[in-house]
Amino acid sequence: PTLHSARLAISGSGGIGIADSCGLQFVQEVFAEKNCAEKLNPGTDAVIELGGEDAKILFFGRHFDARMNDSCAGGTGAFIDQMASLLNVETPQMNELAQQAQNTYTIASRCGVFAKSDIQPLLNQGAEKSDLAASIFHAVASQAITGLAKGRPISGNVLYLGGPLTFMSCLCDAFDSVLNIKGVCPENSLLYVAMGAAFCAEHEVDLTTLPEKLQAAAAQHSFEHLPPLFKNEDEYTVFKKRHSKESVAIGTPEEASEAFIGIDSGSTTIKIAVMSPDGKLLDSFYQSNKGNPVVAVRNYLTDFYTKYPHCRLLAGAVTGYGEDLIRHGFGVDYGIVETMAHFYAAQYLEPEVDFILDIGGQDMKCLKIHNGAIDNIFLNEACSSGCGSFLQTFAEILGYTAEQFAQIGLKADMPVDLGSRCTVFMNSSVKQAQKDGASVANISAGLSISIVKNALYKVIRPASKEAIGKHIVVQGGTFLNDCVLRAFEQEMDLNVIRPNIAGLMGAYGAALYAQRRYKDAPHQTTLLNLQQLGEFVHTVKGMTCGLCNNHCHLTVNTFAGGKRFISGNRCERPITHMAPKDELNLYRQKLQLLKELPVNETPKRGIMGIPMGLNMYELLPFWNALLSSLGFKVVHSPIEDKTIYRLGQGTIPSDTVCYPAKLMHGHIKWLLQQGITNIFYPCMTYNIDEQGTENCYNCPVVAYYPEVLHANIRDLNKPEINFFYDYLGLLHKKKLVKKLQEMFAKAYPDITKDEIRKAVDAAFTAFYDYEAQVKAKGQEIISKAREEHKPIVVLAGRPYHIDPKVNHSIDRLITNMGAALVSEDAVSSHIKTKELNRDLQVLNQWTYHGRLYAAAEYVAQNPDMHLIQLVSFGCGCDAITADECRRLLEERGRIYTQIKIDDIDNLGAAKIRIRSLFSAAQLFDIDNN
């Protein structure tokens, strides 16, 4: 029988507008889901639900609590869809792949585009897709737990709801593994919100008239829009004509007997340029690498040799994310960092170029040129929402190729104002615009404008339009999109140069570089020939290195003849089987000093545990001496144990706090697991006064994180645990003695004031000895580097940035490139702080900040030194220090380099930044000499 009426209610993120327009009952989705779970699954303790763009955890019990994602759609169904697209598989295949996994990698899940920055280098290095699929599921589970549970334990009877958890058993397994539980995905798990809404429905609705009401509601919407990119067809014709003037001469391989080849193995695409000795582009290749750049390069070279046997390739160069893999696999003569490749190409086309903007698949490079040399480099730090993959993702979602999507956007009459949000969350804005009646053309144009705003206001951040330059070259595949190019010119109100080979400039620059190097030293090319390509073999195997405590996940690529390329290593040990040489690395020498601190082996008062993180990387010598003097044996948590983070993951209350702070939860958990009942980690508003700064504050996280740990790690509140987290200061000895006596009074009333006074004296002596050793070792490294004519890098950060878990061995990456390395505290004392304060544009009131400013000033005064600042994601304070350090360096004509770090240990982007700095500095020196 036909159903004419029913009790009906609507729920879900898109339901409230429909309910209002049609006069229907709306039930909030959390309430609907809670209602259904209580009716169908009594005794449920928690619900974890992943949807398309939302994620939620519901806690049942005496106090019901709901946690939902608010500003980021990372770690949801849309995130998994995007990762499947990146792996070039259908979403359902992700589960099949994950079932075959042998290893897992650390992948970011806070942002879909940022995750590409972790996955794409692994793909380019030959990592197995099955391992990556499993890693993505683990990342989603970690994101949900740390981002939503915020430290609240998840245990007991747990339901898994929503599409991703329903259709992907390996995702459920990942949650089970991280939470150490066995959750249940119930029958009708997709329908709990709908069934809950039905249980709540109170009013009968006439179903025969409902379709008309829904259609009427759909026609009422409108959307915010911007002016069109082109007013009419004539304006577009003039635009095309202007940009057709800037071009590289085009030839054919038939007309040349010799050529140079450049390969750009990018994040998502492979670009190849074959160039004649007089600069003509003879042949080119541009396509998606489909997660396997090796196959694409082999096919191209085989095809070229077969078609043009008369055209001899004299030399080749490779650049991009896959540079090392392609160079090893195909015997390419030279490698060049991609920033320099793009610079060579732009300078060849426009000798007076003073600014280059390259937007690729997931990275953005901005090069400031002065007097024919690179003066400064900007790269997108983490987010790729202003890049080509951003547009490509949406084109595919809407059912178009990137080229079709761009053409459609040219005809937009009302581009949607989408702002500049992150990729995964932009899904919501695009879907809302569609509901509001926006055409695909207006969405395409709106997204192009968003890309430009991201580039300008989140990466370049110019003080004015004039500051960018007068001779601007834009390149990269994204600028082949006329919508993006037009949006950039409109936003900046100036005309720019887009070469006819904008998408090939990296490859063309690599070919120019190969030609330059070949002219300097002619030789027989090492490129594989046609016969060798016919015998070409490439196998990939994942393994975990056991040669040190890093336990790096290695990807071993084996080629014909047994030649191997290993990636994923953070030192040379897997290749050389020798321990890294750290005599010119102050980071490692500081760690060694901390490891060699004396231990009280005859403690009269037992063991005192110290969590080895944050300010303990500076103050351990102080507290070790003090506590040892008081009769304790000091045991600190491990320095190089990568499992520490997961130990405390479930107790982290905020996903936005910096990674070094998150690690503290694991350090405390480790100490508790060892049965240690005394844990010492005091709150410290102030640091040691280093004289000259306006004050000597610690940052709020360093100062007060013990409070966060006490509030979120329940075991610290057990009666048998003594957690010493009182507020202490090192500015006044007498006050410190008094506070320590008060702190220990309850647990150790026998500790006398005289004992504490002697212990404090011993602590200050030990600390100043350690400080002197650091400065002396730093000076030794600087002197030796100058004797050996090595570049000197001041890797400037905070004390805890020497932690290998935090810096991911970036220090060794730098020294492996041939540089000497010191930390900011080794050089900061050379600067008179009071004089520096007069030049600063910020209040110098934080101890760590003061060292950074002084180090930047010292580097600016020493031409053989370069500063690289390490910044942890989530560090609000370093938003200030980064700008001020940049200013101090750039006003002296020096290059500022920043590397942002968190829990992700793939160093592909960091390597590009460091090589770019060294290459630019070398060019600058040559130019000035």
Where are the model-predicted features located?
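Glycine-rich phosphate-binding/hydrolytic loop that grips phosphoryl groups
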Residues: 80-82, 187-221, 344, 388-393, ...
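Gly/Thr-rich phosphate-binding beta-strand-loop-beta motif of the actin/hexokinase/Hsp70
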Residues: 44-61, 250-282, 353-370, 544-548, ...
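Conserved phosphate-binding/catalytic loops in two-lobed NTP-binding clefts
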Residues: 26-30, 176-195, 333-340, 489-508, ...
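Glycine-rich phosphate-binding loop plus the immediately following alpha-helix
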Residues: 62-103, 190-193, 199-203, 284-294, ...
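Glycine-rich phosphate-binding loops at beta-strand->alpha-helix junctions
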Residues: 14, 148-178, 189-193, 319-322, ...
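Short beta-strand-loop/turn "lid" adjacent to the catalytic site in phosphate-handling enzymes
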Residues: 1-31, 58-67, 277, 289, ...
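Phosphate/ATP-binding catalytic cores across multiple sugar-kinase/actin-like superfamilies
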Residues: 132-156, 197, 240-249, 446-469, ...
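An N-terminal assembly and electron-transfer interface module characteristic of large anaerobic redox
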Residues: 69, 73-80, 383-391, 398, ...
